[in-house]
Protein backbone atom coordinates (compact mmCIF):
# COMPACT_ATOMS: atom_id res chain seq x y z
CA UNK A 1 0.00 0.00 0.00
CA UNK A 2 2.81 2.43 0.87
CA UNK A 3 4.52 2.07 -2.54
CA UNK A 4 1.22 2.77 -4.30
CA UNK A 5 0.82 6.03 -2.38
CA UNK A 6 4.49 6.97 -2.86
CA UNK A 7 3.93 6.79 -6.62
CA UNK A 8 0.60 8.62 -6.46
CA UNK A 9 2.16 11.35 -4.31
CA UNK A 10 4.96 11.84 -6.84
CA UNK A 11 2.53 11.83 -9.78
CA UNK A 12 0.25 14.43 -8.18
CA UNK A 13 3.23 16.57 -7.09
CA UNK A 14 4.52 16.65 -10.66
CA UNK A 15 1.12 17.83 -11.96
CA UNK A 16 0.24 20.57 -9.47
CA UNK A 17 1.21 24.20 -9.88
CA UNK A 18 4.09 25.15 -7.59
CA UNK A 19 5.28 28.36 -5.98
CA UNK A 20 8.82 29.32 -5.05
CA UNK A 21 9.64 27.42 -1.85
CA UNK A 22 11.88 30.17 -0.45
CA UNK A 23 9.09 32.74 -0.88
CA UNK A 24 6.63 30.39 0.82
CA UNK A 25 9.01 29.71 3.72
CA UNK A 26 9.89 33.36 4.25
CA UNK A 27 6.25 34.46 4.05
CA UNK A 28 5.30 31.85 6.64
CA UNK A 29 8.18 33.04 8.83
CA UNK A 30 6.92 36.62 8.61
CA UNK A 31 3.46 35.41 9.65
CA UNK A 32 4.81 33.59 12.71
CA UNK A 33 6.95 36.60 13.65
CA UNK A 34 3.92 38.89 13.45
CA UNK A 35 1.86 36.51 15.60
CA UNK A 36 4.60 36.53 18.25
CA UNK A 37 4.52 40.34 18.27
CA UNK A 38 0.71 40.44 18.39
CA UNK A 39 0.11 37.83 21.09
CA UNK A 40 3.29 37.88 23.23
CA UNK A 41 2.13 34.65 24.98
CA UNK A 42 3.69 31.79 23.01
CA UNK A 43 0.86 29.38 23.87
CA UNK A 44 -1.57 31.81 22.21
CA UNK A 45 0.66 31.82 19.11
CA UNK A 46 0.52 28.00 19.03
CA UNK A 47 -3.28 28.11 19.32
CA UNK A 48 -3.60 30.75 16.59
CA UNK A 49 -1.36 28.78 14.20
CA UNK A 50 -3.45 25.66 14.79
CA UNK A 51 -6.69 27.60 14.22
CA UNK A 52 -5.34 29.12 11.01
CA UNK A 53 -4.33 25.65 9.83
CA UNK A 54 -7.79 24.30 10.64
CA UNK A 55 -9.39 26.97 8.46
CA UNK A 56 -6.99 26.11 5.64
CA UNK A 57 -7.58 22.36 6.06
CA UNK A 58 -11.36 22.55 5.73
CA UNK A 59 -10.86 24.18 2.32
CA UNK A 60 -7.74 22.34 1.19
CA UNK A 61 -9.39 18.91 1.37
CA UNK A 62 -11.50 19.69 -1.69
CA UNK A 63 -8.43 20.47 -3.78
CA UNK A 64 -6.69 17.39 -2.42
CA UNK A 65 -9.56 15.06 -3.30
CA UNK A 66 -10.05 16.61 -6.74
CA UNK A 67 -6.39 16.53 -7.79
CA UNK A 68 -5.39 13.22 -6.21
CA UNK A 69 -8.43 11.24 -7.32
CA UNK A 70 -8.41 9.36 -4.02
CA UNK A 71 -11.74 8.04 -2.80
CA UNK A 72 -12.78 7.11 0.73
CA UNK A 73 -10.04 5.33 2.68
CA UNK A 74 -10.91 1.92 4.07
CA UNK A 75 -9.54 2.60 7.56
CA UNK A 76 -7.45 4.98 9.66
CA UNK A 77 -4.25 3.15 8.69
CA UNK A 78 -4.85 3.89 5.01
CA UNK A 79 -5.81 7.48 5.89
CA UNK A 80 -2.47 7.93 7.66
CA UNK A 81 -0.56 6.63 4.62
CA UNK A 82 -2.48 8.93 2.28
CA UNK A 83 -1.71 11.95 4.48
CA UNK A 84 1.97 11.06 4.70
CA UNK A 85 2.67 9.98 1.13
CA UNK A 86 0.20 12.01 -0.94
CA UNK A 87 -0.92 15.01 1.12
CA UNK A 88 2.49 16.10 2.37
CA UNK A 89 4.04 15.46 -1.05
CA UNK A 90 1.30 17.34 -2.91
CA UNK A 91 1.30 20.47 -0.77
CA UNK A 92 4.80 20.63 0.74
CA UNK A 93 6.89 18.56 -1.66
CA UNK A 94 8.06 16.15 1.06
CA UNK A 95 7.15 12.68 2.24
CA UNK A 96 6.31 11.99 5.84
CA UNK A 97 6.57 8.63 7.60
CA UNK A 98 3.88 6.92 9.66
CA UNK A 99 4.87 4.96 12.75
CA UNK A 100 4.37 4.29 16.45
CA UNK A 101 0.81 3.00 16.10
CA UNK A 102 -1.02 2.24 19.33
CA UNK A 103 -2.60 -1.20 19.86
CA UNK A 104 -6.07 -0.04 18.75
CA UNK A 105 -4.77 1.60 15.56
CA UNK A 106 -6.35 4.91 16.62
CA UNK A 107 -3.11 6.83 17.20
CA UNK A 108 0.07 7.25 15.18
CA UNK A 109 3.08 9.52 14.86
CA UNK A 110 3.85 11.32 11.61
CA UNK A 111 7.55 12.06 11.17
CA UNK A 112 8.64 14.82 8.82
CA UNK A 113 12.34 14.46 8.03
CA UNK A 114 12.73 17.65 5.98
CA UNK A 115 10.08 20.16 7.05
CA UNK A 116 10.14 22.95 4.43
CA UNK A 117 8.45 25.43 6.80
CA UNK A 118 11.55 25.61 8.97
CA UNK A 119 14.16 26.33 6.30
CA UNK A 120 16.14 29.46 7.22
CA UNK A 121 14.69 29.42 10.77
CA UNK A 122 16.49 29.39 14.08
CA UNK A 123 14.45 29.67 17.26
CA UNK A 124 15.73 31.78 20.14
CA UNK A 125 16.34 29.71 23.27
CA UNK A 126 13.32 31.18 25.08
CA UNK A 127 11.00 29.69 22.42
CA UNK A 128 12.53 26.21 22.22
CA UNK A 129 10.14 23.50 23.47
CA UNK A 130 7.43 26.18 23.75
CA UNK A 131 6.72 27.50 20.26
CA UNK A 132 5.55 24.85 17.80
CA UNK A 133 6.60 26.81 14.76
CA UNK A 134 4.89 24.48 12.26
CA UNK A 135 1.72 24.06 14.35
CA UNK A 136 -0.27 25.19 11.33
CA UNK A 137 0.23 21.64 9.97
CA UNK A 138 -1.65 20.18 12.94
CA UNK A 139 -4.58 22.45 12.18
CA UNK A 140 -4.54 21.63 8.47
CA UNK A 141 -4.76 17.91 9.24
CA UNK A 142 -7.50 18.42 11.83
CA UNK A 143 -9.59 20.55 9.47
CA UNK A 144 -9.13 18.32 6.44
CA UNK A 145 -9.90 15.12 8.35
CA UNK A 146 -12.97 16.65 9.95
CA UNK A 147 -14.34 17.28 6.46
CA UNK A 148 -14.05 13.55 5.75
CA UNK A 149 -15.81 12.61 9.00
CA UNK A 150 -12.80 12.06 11.28
CA UNK A 151 -12.39 14.05 14.46
CA UNK A 152 -8.71 14.00 15.37
CA UNK A 153 -6.36 15.67 17.79
CA UNK A 154 -2.95 16.59 16.40
CA UNK A 155 -0.04 17.75 18.55
CA UNK A 156 3.64 18.32 17.92
CA UNK A 157 5.77 16.01 20.04
CA UNK A 158 9.16 16.79 18.46
CA UNK A 159 10.53 19.71 16.50
CA UNK A 160 13.97 20.07 14.94
CA UNK A 161 13.92 23.77 15.86
CA UNK A 162 13.93 22.66 19.51
CA UNK A 163 17.02 20.50 18.91
CA UNK A 164 15.10 17.25 18.27
CA UNK A 165 16.35 15.06 15.41
CA UNK A 166 13.04 15.18 13.51
CA UNK A 167 9.71 16.94 13.46
CA UNK A 168 7.00 14.60 14.72
CA UNK A 169 3.25 15.04 15.02
CA UNK A 170 1.03 12.78 17.12
CA UNK A 171 -2.38 12.16 15.51
CA UNK A 172 -5.18 10.63 17.59
CA UNK A 173 -8.51 9.56 16.11
CA UNK A 174 -11.07 10.70 18.68
CA UNK A 175 -14.24 9.88 16.80
CA UNK A 176 -15.59 8.89 13.40
CA UNK A 177 -18.28 11.46 12.77
CA UNK A 178 -21.66 10.52 11.39
CA UNK A 179 -22.08 11.37 7.75
CA UNK A 180 -25.84 11.52 8.04
CA UNK A 181 -27.45 14.55 6.45
CA UNK A 182 -29.01 16.90 9.03
CA UNK A 183 -32.80 17.04 9.12
CA UNK A 184 -34.14 19.45 6.53
CA UNK A 185 -31.07 19.33 4.25
CA UNK A 186 -32.19 16.57 1.91
Swiss-Prot record:
Entry annotated with the keyword Cell division: no
InterPro entries named in the record: Bet3, NO_sig/Golgi_transp_ligand-bd, TRAPP_component
GO cellular component: cis-Golgi network membrane; cytosol; endoplasmic reticulum; TRAPP complex
Pfam family, one: TRAPP
Keyword Transferase: no
GO biological process terms, semicolon-separated: endoplasmic reticulum to Golgi vesicle-mediated transport; intra-Golgi vesicle-mediated transport
Entry keywords, A to Z: Endoplasmic reticulum, ER-Golgi transport, Golgi apparatus, Transport
Localization of this protein: Golgi apparatus, cis-Golgi network; Endoplasmic reticulum
SUPFAM superfamilies the record matches: Ligand-binding domain in the NO signalling and Golgi transport (SSF111126)
UniProt-listed CDD domains: TRAPPC3_bet3
Gene3D superfamilies with a match to the protein in the record: Trafficking protein particle complex subunit 3
Known role: May play a role in vesicular transport from endoplasmic reticulum to Golgi.
Subunit comment: Homodimer. Part of the multisubunit TRAPP (transport protein particle) complex.
Protein family (similarity comment): Belongs to the TRAPP small subunits family. BET3 subfamily.
UniProt protein name: Trafficking protein particle complex subunit 3
Originating species: Dictyostelium discoideum
Upper taxonomic lineage: Eukaryota, Amoebozoa, Evosea, Eumycetozoa, Dictyostelia
Amino acid sequence: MSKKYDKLGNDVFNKVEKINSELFTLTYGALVTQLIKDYEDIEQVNIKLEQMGYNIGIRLIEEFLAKSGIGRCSDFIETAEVIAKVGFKMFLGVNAHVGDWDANRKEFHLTIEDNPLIDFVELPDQYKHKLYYSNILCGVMRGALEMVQMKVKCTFVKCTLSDDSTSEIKVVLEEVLSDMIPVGYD
